[in-house]
Amino acid sequence: MPNLTHTPLPRRLLLALMLCAATSLPALAREGVDVGGNSAFSKLVPAESVERSATQQYAQLLQQAAAQNALGPKDNAQVRRLRAIAQRIIPFTGVWNPRARDWQWEVNLIGSRQVNAFCMPGGKIAFYTGILNQLKLSDDEVAMVMGHEVAHALREHARKRMGKSAVTQGAARLGGAVVASVLGIDPRLTDAAARGGANLLTLEFSREDESEADLVGMELAARAGYDPRAGVSLWQKMGAANKNAPPQWLSTHPSGKSRIKEIEANLPKVLPLYERARRG
């Protein structure tokens, strides 16, 4: 007969199991998509520096647009539409990035044939008339685009790219010491990245970043009461627009059936959020 006498777990093992259980509970309890934590590379660059640069570059862009009579006035129907959609999405951003609660959000429309939109760090959103007019986007589809771009800012993808750049530059200079600098956050790398003056308007994101932005954006839209299934029709329209020449917005974004497939695979995670938002 086997000995069923209870044998106490070693204290260190018990503590490890308790820690694992504690850290896994929030993930199990959370509704919506699962994209993991933010990249450690973003910690190499101060968030304040990135947001300050974004504010300056955004202001310059608006000044240039205004000088060309291409900045949509606040009473423009499309401007009102974009700002109304943003007002529904913004309340759900703080969960993804606590700093977003203090961002000075801005939403503007720029007259241009470019099929493009973006959200810079700090909540600086801009749409080009081309993406609205050429693709004839519904409100749900606009919310998917906006959610995607806002997700880039919330997940600090620009900050991550700048951090990676700092590591690359530091590696050439410091050789093997770069590993220690990543773990210890060498201030020289931080300073180099902060002084780099990255053009946040033209910064390209990785395929992983784009996939993450798709999913987080879809959840933001769903929580705001916009149908996340619009992500499928959006990318179908993008694909059709891509037949002749790739729109600027697509040139740095992965496309194709795999993207739609990933959105469809995650719909069960966000459709309940959408239905709940609709019921109010």
Where does each model-flagged region fall?
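A Zn2+-metalloprotease active-site environment signal
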Residues: 2-280
